[in-house]
Amino acid sequence: MKKLYKFDKDELWYAEYWISDLKKVIIHTGKVGTKGTTEELDFSNFDQNDKKLDDFFQDRFRKMGFNEFHSDNLYWLVVQYKMKSLKGNTRDYWLRDKATDYLNDELGWKGLGHVDGFDMGKTITDSKKFVLNIFCVVVNEELGINAIKRCLKEYRLDYTQIKIASRKYSFDGQYKLKSN
């Protein structure tokens, strides 16, 4: 999978491709924050050669002004849920799996980013409180937060119980609370 971005009239656009399970090349393009459109190509046109496909994609979209998104412009978003114990319970594990899957789909299909992982454990401020943290990397902080809220609400994943915090991707300091 390869993803490129470009700014056009103060709007951020994305273009990405991947190879489907059916051996089709899927090219997905759109304005960041929207689902965009897909185009299917037959992978056999590329002689099963990933480099040839990557060159085709890069050539096509770089001519239109698309480039890699610099990591200095990325954001970490952490979605936090309270847990009742350090080990968590069945609900916590279910919530972790469902929220991670749905958020990864939501962020990916809208060109916003992806889920990078999760952790479950004690809070930094109070060792007697426990949380599930889901870490997301996004290209636009505000659109990412809005997409996360909308997704968790739509799929009824304890939306009213979350906190969302943010920090620049390249910054190694504290997160700043954005929503609770």
Locate the predicted segments by residue.
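Short, hydrophobic/aromatic-rich segments at coil-to-beta transitions
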Residues: 1-6
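A short, exposed loop/beta-hairpin motif centered on an aromatic-Gly-Thr core
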Residues: 34-48, 132-138
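A short, charged, amphipathic alpha-helix used as a generic interaction element across diverse proteins
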Residues: 44-62, 145-153
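Surface-exposed beta-loop interaction hotspot
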Residues: 56-98
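Surface-exposed, low-hydrophobicity interaction/linker segments
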Residues: 85-119
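Short, intrinsically disordered low-complexity segments
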Residues: 107-146
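Conserved short beta-strand edge segments in small beta-sheet-based binding/regulatory domains
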Residues: 154-171
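Short, low-order "capping/linker" segments at domain edges
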Residues: 170-180
